[in-house]
């Protein structure tokens, strides 16, 4: 799918009132490496295009290679157990438990076709394991329907509880996983196929 077609669609998208996580539109924005949110506190979000220093695991920085530090999605920090809702009508593309240290943990990728000829995917990382139980490719969800919950640090790849939300215009052959962090030298390429999700999430 072309970036131009997506940009035309997203530019005309009207607010839906749907929040991927309850309270997102009242959330605090900011540069985030880590943000522990307790129950009852305002949730926090940020991270698209950030060049981050916290990715020290071998997954992101193999010895002798350029590290991956540029974040390709938006992180929404909320307590473990927070419900996750799809922003658009969707079908399950794939799911997987990515259990390397620092990885996504339980992950779901949804497929969206909001208008004829336009198809893209959204990735939801750091979920709880129960979110994947009984989930099959092709399972349909209506816009605003709950389909997952955030996982604890023990099951979400070792991170403070949060949702990694990412738009993917070119999924290729990927299933249940997709790069969420890019090398600086490849920044422009990856940001072109993983555009800023802010408008889809109803954020400024």
List the predicted regions and their residue ranges.
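Short alpha-helix capping/helix-loop boundary micro-motifs
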Residues: 77-78, 127-135
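Short beta-strand micro-motifs in enzyme catalytic cores
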Residues: 74, 106-108, 161-163
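Terminal peptide-recognition signature
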Residues: 76, 90, 110, 144, ...
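Zn2+-dependent peptidoglycan hydrolase active-site motif and core
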Residues: 86-131
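Polar/charged, compositionally biased leader and regulatory segments
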Residues: 1-75, 79, 186-204
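Histidine-centered active-site/metal-ligand motif
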Residues: 71, 112, 126, 162-164
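Acidic, glycine-rich catalytic/binding loops that coordinate metals and/or anionic ligands
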Residues: 2-17, 133-155, 159-204
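Short, glycine/small-residue-enriched coil/turn segments at secondary-structure junctions
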Residues: 65-101
């Amino acid at each position: 799918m072309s970036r131009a077609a997506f940009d035309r669609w997203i530019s005309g998208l009207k607010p839906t009132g749907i929040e991927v996580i309850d309270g997102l539109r009242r959330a605090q924005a900011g540069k985030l490496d880590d943000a522990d949110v307790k129950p009852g506190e305002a949730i926090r979000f940020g991270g698209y295009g950030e060049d981050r220093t916290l990715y020290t695991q071998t997954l992101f920085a193999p010895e002798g290679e350029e590290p991956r530090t540029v974040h390709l999605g938006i992180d929404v920090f909320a307590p473990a157990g927070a419900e996750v809702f799809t922003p658009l009508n969707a079908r399950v593309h794939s799911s997987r438990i990515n259990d390397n240290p620092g990885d996504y943990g339980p992950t779901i990728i949804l497929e969206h076709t909001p208008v004829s000829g336009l198809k893209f995917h959204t990735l939801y990382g750091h979920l709880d394991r129960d979110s994947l139980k009984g989930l099959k490719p092709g399972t349909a969800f209506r816009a605003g329907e709950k389909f997952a919950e955030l996982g604890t640090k023990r099951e979400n790849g070792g991170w403070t509880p949060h949702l990694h939300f990412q738009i993917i215009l070119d999924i290729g052959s990927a299933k249940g996983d997709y790069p969420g962090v890019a090398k600086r030298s490849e920044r422009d390429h990856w940001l072109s196929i993983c555009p800023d999700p802010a408008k889809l999430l109803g954020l400024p």
